[in-house]
Amino acid sequence: MVSIPEYYEGKNILLTGATGFLGKVLLEKLLRSCPKVNSVYVLVRQKAGQTPQERVEEILSGKLFDRLRDENPDFRQKIIAINSELTQPKLALSEEDKEIIIDSTNVIFHCAATVRFNENLRDAVQLNVIATRQLILLAQQMKNLEVFMHVSTAYAYCNRKHIDEVVYPPPVDPKKLIDSLEWMDDGLVNDITPKLIGDRPNTYIYTKALAEYVVQQEGAKLNVAIVRPSIVGASWKEPFPGWIDNFNGPSGLFIAAGKGILRTMRASNNALADLVPVDVVVNTSLAAAWYSGVNRPRNIMVYNCTTGSTNPFHWGEVGDYLNHSFKTNPLNQVFRHPYVKFYSNNLMLHYWKGVKHTVPALLLDLALRLTGQKPWMMKTITRLHKAMVFLEYFTSNSWVWNTDNVNMLMNQLNPEDKKTFNIDVRQLHWAEYIENYCMGTKKYVLNEEMSGLPAARKHLNKLRNIRYGFNTILVILIWRIFIARSQMARNIWYFVVSLCYKFLSYFRASSTMRY
């Protein structure tokens, strides 16, 4: 069987979502590890006055592509930016571009999607379902297409606790929903959305389930594969550890925790934190397309790209590793020392949110107003709480994903491909991964220089000393109040002080005897 780089040699690839986190990493990996690929057609829309070519060039100039630039300086010649708007009829392709794509494309990687959990249903259907259907219809016209690779989500069927590598029946017929949305106004759509999505937490998950069914039904005559990643996080190894460039998903919460703003949130400490590194998702996608292209399986291949069943990791551990990582390598100008703790009990959660989030925010804003500055902390906390609501469903529940196809795929790789396209998450060391993830948020999201670490540590130590001093003064004041009113409290106070004095005297005497 040919290797993965050999399979992609001379191939023309069509990629959607190249400006997104996953799409960027896939583009970089494809060009670096399969250097003999012929060309990559990247569907990109105009945005903020930038042409598709300018947007692609901006991506290629980023740090993500540093390694590729060193290894293959001429890689840009293989990338062809094509003006396309996935939400428009026929993808808004020009006739010339459409003809080139139809004649040349061998493999499609469909990574584009709206990943906003609070997206309104109409827009989510437009990009996640209708755009996918239009791309399938375009693929049916392609003369040399070998594989259609669709990137979905492992949570598409989160209404089930055990999820196999199959496409389940949709919650509603996508065609009927699309037809209905055409005559509904926005108010009506918003009113019926909760009833439509039912036991799914948001429109993103709901529409990704519909998209899978569209791919299965409309692409019945195509060679289709679906990869379902769980919570996509920073890179594990490639192109370098800890690569992340956005605030989406856990990254924003990690940064809020590192800044000392996030102190508590709803999560079950024993629930599985099914994080999967972005490079594992990319490697799985490239390998899955290779397998389908070489073996031409009769049925659609679905791959649950998850970690929980093979290398379980829990939210309680996430909190512990976050606290340790950000105390060792703090972010610049943290608000408080990093310490986040998860609660599943409603009473405890609301109590600590009030004590650790709301009250400090109000006090800081009051101080800012008194000094003539603009208050900002309470707005930040409010936005943080809204973001937490969208993630609580995933931090409070666990699922079991069947990964037989992923295991089969791993066994099909030759020794060299297993190294180059590593998908074996059993080798993943979570403490090291979270540490690199935290460092990645510092370097690549917040753009903080590593040379500033000594100053950041000094600032963190200063905050620690202030906290210790404040707590000491608070304890003394409380005890003084009780001592002034109670003989019993005075007796307890003097007893404790006496014990401390005796302990210190004994410690001093023991130290002297040793020498």
From Swiss-Prot:
Main location class: membrane
Catalytic activity, as annotated: a long-chain fatty acyl-CoA + 2 NADPH + 2 H(+) = a long-chain primary fatty alcohol + 2 NADP(+) + CoA; hexadecanoyl-CoA + 2 NADPH + 2 H(+) = hexadecan-1-ol + 2 NADP(+) + CoA; octadecanoyl-CoA + 2 NADPH + 2 H(+) = octadecan-1-ol + 2 NADP(+) + CoA; (9Z)-octadecenoyl-CoA + 2 NADPH + 2 H(+) = (9Z)-octadecen-1-ol + 2 NADP(+) + CoA
GO biological process, any: wax biosynthetic process
Transmembrane segments: 466-483
SS bond partners: none
GO molecular function: alcohol-forming long-chain fatty acyl-CoA reductase activity; alcohol-forming very long-chain fatty acyl-CoA reductase activity
Region listing for Necessary and sufficient for PEX19-mediated localization into peroxisome membrane, in residue ranges: 451-507
Location within or outside the cell: Peroxisome membrane
One GO location term (cellular component): peroxisomal membrane
Membrane topology field: Single-pass membrane protein
Protein keywords: Lipid biosynthesis, Lipid metabolism, Membrane, NADP, Oxidoreductase, Peroxisome, Transmembrane, Transmembrane helix
EC number: 1.2.1.84
Pfam family, one: NAD_binding_4
Cited Gene3D superfamilies: NAD(P)-binding Rossmann-like Domain (3.40.50.720)
Residue ranges, Peroxisomal side: 484-515
Cytoplasmic face residues: 1-465
Family membership noted in the UniProt record: Belongs to the fatty acyl-CoA reductase family.
Role: Catalyzes the reduction of saturated and unsaturated C16 or C18 fatty acyl-CoA to fatty alcohols. It plays an essential role in the production of ether lipids/plasmalogens which synthesis requires fatty alcohols. In parallel, it is also required for wax monoesters production since fatty alcohols also constitute a substrate for their synthesis.
Subunit structure: Interacts with PEX19; PEX19 mediates the targeting of FAR1 to peroxisomes.
Protein's UniProt name: Fatty acyl-CoA reductase 1
Species assigned in the record: Rattus norvegicus (Rat)
